[in-house]
Amino acid sequence: CRHFVDRDMHKMTGLGMEYRIDSSELLAARGFCQHWTESATCNTGDSFLTELTDIEGDVVDMEAYAQAFVCRAKEIPFISVKYVSDVIGQNSVKHWEDRLEDARAGLSHFFNVLKESI
């Protein structure tokens, strides 16, 4: 993900609060991820979603917006690589536990392929 939305901050846009971050410009300025064609959006919030709602984004988590915010403030390029471990509305705790090994293997493969291309 290169785009980040904070669903909690979105509720405060009337107060001038920012709720979107696009890290593409800083990544491009540093020459990172130029060959990546996919561009996903991560929706972040402080609550655990248990049902599908009308949210902006491709994946949901609870931390990426804050990470992107700090990295942007420090001018550090940031990208978030996510492995979807559960589906909103299903038994997420059980799915998460079952998928940990799959996530570990999938992310390991992703970073090994990435390392070979650098």
Locations of regions flagged by a protein language model:
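Glycine-rich phosphate- or other oxyanion-binding loops that anchor nucleotides, phosphorylated ligands
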Residues: C1-I118
